[in-house]
From Swiss-Prot:
Signal peptide as annotated in the record: 1-22
Presence of the UniProt keyword Metal-binding in the record: yes
Active site: R240
Location in or out of the cell: Secreted
MF-aspect GO terms: metal ion binding; pectate lyase activity
Disulfide pairings: C93-C176, C351-C374
A GO biological-process term: pectin catabolic process
Required cofactor(s): Ca(2+)
UniProt protein name: Pectate lyase B
Cofactor note: Binds 1 Ca(2+) ion per subunit.
GO CC, alphabetical: extracellular region
Role: Involved in maceration and soft-rotting of plant tissue.
Length: 375
């Protein structure tokens, strides 16, 4: 009798079986990345070094290629590309048509951690494809070239168990002439799509980004993906926090400030649990728009906004869409959310406002915000 379990499904079952054994990420992901027994530790001073180290980890001592990787891997990145970042910042509208730069982690399931050394910086993306158990921490990534070639800062495709933690991602929330919607600037900060699931995005500082990120590639990419966004700071961003198509998104203890178009856009029957966040100076921070149907639903709890009367206090405004849409302009829950399968201890929304900047982003020694710091 033929097996009814596909390779992808088998990978997800493996992820479930390891759920209680790996590191606690505060979200759906449970992984130690490459930081496990038998790991090989390397230092990379450039993008190409990272590429070479990963490729070398795909073959054994005899030079034979090993499916999924020959050994778990921890890479410390020490490079500094501030000169490229500064040049791009001085020529924002010239970046779109350049060649995209990035490290592709493809078909690697043995476990991989990339951690940026303090003071390092990158003008390249990290693209995770058909891989699992990937951790990226303390990377400062900005002003990437190659928007026309899908030059995302992070792209996660068909990859379960990925954790992006304590990174800084930045560009310019700016429109350049050249297309119908003036979209010739930069690509996304974090796109999660095409079968990617059990992903945790935590303690990142994301600023000056027009298109922050996707959860789902298209209206047909509505897999039952599970993603947690917690303790992130979003500042001066346009939209897609995320743009969610189907699946489940748990967003807690995030700081959203300076949203210029729309925030969490829950589409294609997606479900979102939005709790203990701080919203301010934001346009349509929770919405379901662009499709005209199949509206997503949300549960709102513990946020600094509790009722419509709070909108003026925190400078929250709402805009319509050309198609039928739903805004959270009554600030009420519109659905239910599945039981969260992991333990977490959110701090108050006020503590997020007061303290999160001391913890999110790079150079913070990967510290986390506990309730004891809120006093």
């Amino acid at each position: 009798m033929k097996s009814l379990i596909t390779p992808i499904a088998a990978g997800l079952l493996l992820a479930f079986s390891q759920y209680s054994l790996a590191a606690d990420t505060g979200g759906y992901t449970k992984t130690d990345g490459g930081d496990v027994s038998g790991a090989v530790k390397k230092t990379a001073s450039s993008m190409q070094d990272i590429v070479n180290i990963i490729e070398a980890a795909k073959v054994d001592a005899n030079g034979k290629k090993v499916k999924g990787g020959a050994y778990p891997l921890v890479i410390t990145y020490t490079g500094n590309e501030d000169s490229l970042i500064n040049a791009a910042a001085a020529n924002i509208c010239g970046q779109w048509s350049k060649d995209a730069r990035g490290v592709e982690i493809k078909d690697f399931t043995k476990g991989l951690t990339i951690i940026g050394a303090n003071g390092s910086s990158a003008n390249f993306g990290i693209w995770i494809v058909n891989s699992s158990d990937i951790v990226v921490r303390n990377m400062r990534i900005g002003y990437l070239p190659g928007g026309a070639q899908d030059g995302d800062m992070f792209r996660i495709d068909n990859s379960p168990n990925v954790w992006l933690d304590h990174n800084e991602l930045f560009a310019a929330n700016h429109e350049c002439d050249g297309t119908k919607d003036g979209d010739t600037t930069f690509e996304s900060a974090i796109d999660i799509k095409k079968g990617a699931t059990y992903v945790t995005i935590s303690y990142n500082y994301i600023h000056g980004v027009k298109k922050v990120g996707l959860s789902g590639f298209s209206s047909s990419d509505t897999a039952e993906r599970n993603i947690t966004y917690h303790h992130n700071i979003y500042s001066d961003v346009n939209a897609r926090l995320p743009l969610q198509r189907g699946g489940n998104v748990h967003a807690y203890n995030n700081l959203y400030t300076g949203i210029t178009s729309s925030g969490l856009n829950v589409r294609q029957n997606g479900k979102a649990l939005i709790e203990n966040n701080w919203f301010e100076n934001a346009v349509s921070p929770v919405t379901s728009r662009y499709d005209g149907s199949n509206f997503g639903t949300w549960v709102l709890k513990g946020n600094n906004i509790t009722k419509p009367a709070d909108f003026a206090t925190y400078n929250i405004t709402w805009t319509p869409d050309t198609k039928e849409y739903r805004n959270a302009d009554t600030w009420t829950s519109t659905g239910t959310y599945p039981t969260v399968p992991y333990s977490y201890s959110p701090v108050s929304a006020q503590c997020v406002k007061d303290k999160l900047a001391n913890y999110a982003g790079v150079g913070k020694n990967l510290a986390t915000l506990a309730s004891s710091a809120c006093k």
